[in-house]
Amino acid sequence: MENNYNSFYHLQIAKCGGTYLNNMIVHQLFNILKNNDISYIDGEYHLGWKEIENNYVVSSLRDPVKRTVSHYAYWKNGGQDGAIPKNIPSFMVWVERNTDFISNYQIKNFLYERKNFHLNPFDPRGVDPDFLTIKINKNLAFDRIKRVNVLLKDTQLNYQTCDTVMKKTLKDFNIKDSFYIDNEKKYDHNITKSSTELYNSLTKQDIDYLYNLNSLDSEIYFSQSVYFNAKDF
């Protein structure tokens, strides 16, 4: 069957396992696609949705509570090459102050398209106003999520699944190049000790509050039908 895809995009959502996916398969995929004259879009800049015809999209979602905790821990430690914030508030205070930014963060990435590279959808200190003012359109967001070719749940981020995803993606592009994933190497999930400790310290009330704050993220995260299933490949 003739392949209709002419570009590849990793829709990388902050603190959702994108670094792991990049290290496992995406960087290698980029090189293979380039050698086969297939264009690709580098999603490491958290670009949001890209409305491109015949675009092959890969993405991953994370438990909304763990994602929010990880976002705070990353920000608290200065992020990537950033200054460590002064007068750091507690986690729950930070969440309350940044509700417009942090709530349903994953869904927003399917409704947002980054246009200004001097601003970003990641750091509350310099966040893109376009991200903060997104009007949530559940139907549109869910429709776009269903259009993702390979959507992985955080619990699927392992060697076996990534190996299958790599095979599927190359097959979908009608590419027969070989690839290699070192299953002995510990690929970076970019999860810090402080993030894990903070999550483990949350009360049930905290967790319930965060799931409710991220109600649409929670709905799609726990919807098993949207995720990649190796049995279908």
What does each model-identified segment do?
Residues 1-233:
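Membrane-interface amphipathic segments in extracytoplasmic regions
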